[in-house]
Amino acid sequence: MDMAQAVQENSVDEDNKRFVPDEVWESIEEVEETLEFLISQYGSFEGPLVYPVILKETRDNIGYVQLCPIDNGNWEIGYHIGKKYTGNGYATEAVKAFLPVITKQAGISEVYGICLVENVASLAVMRKCGFVNVFRGIDKYQGVDREIVKNIWKA
């Protein structure tokens, strides 16, 4: 399966639609345009900094890990593993490998992890990767007031 097809298929699972609705692509063409843009960002550290998660054994693209600039010079981590690959520790492995390297290269000293309170899988990944809770309550998430958790990781 090629990269664009894998990204598109992983993006339309129900968990992805619920937790990151702005990262759902209905067509391969949309994915190809997005991938072209993301790849163009690899030469700078302005962001977003998005990298595929590749399964070692099969070389399949099973998801992504990313850092995105948010407000006031802060950065937020994001990650998604395709539904058929979840529950195997891949997100935790990817985040643990990604954060120290990308933050050192980009000169970033802290990263936020923000998710909905009900996204227990994402909260578990952040906890396992050393994030510390700094907020739990109502705030904007995807432009809507929702109950969220904000965690922080420090290099």
Predicted feature locations:
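Acyl-donor (CoA/ACP) binding surface of acyl/acetyltransferases
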Residues: 1-18, 50-155
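Secondary-structure boundary/capping residues
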Residues: 25, 44-47, 111
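Conserved GNAT-fold acetyl-CoA-binding loop/helix
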Residues: 15-37
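A short hydrophobic/aromatic micro-motif that marks alpha-helical segments and, especially, helix-coil
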Residues: 27-29, 42, 145
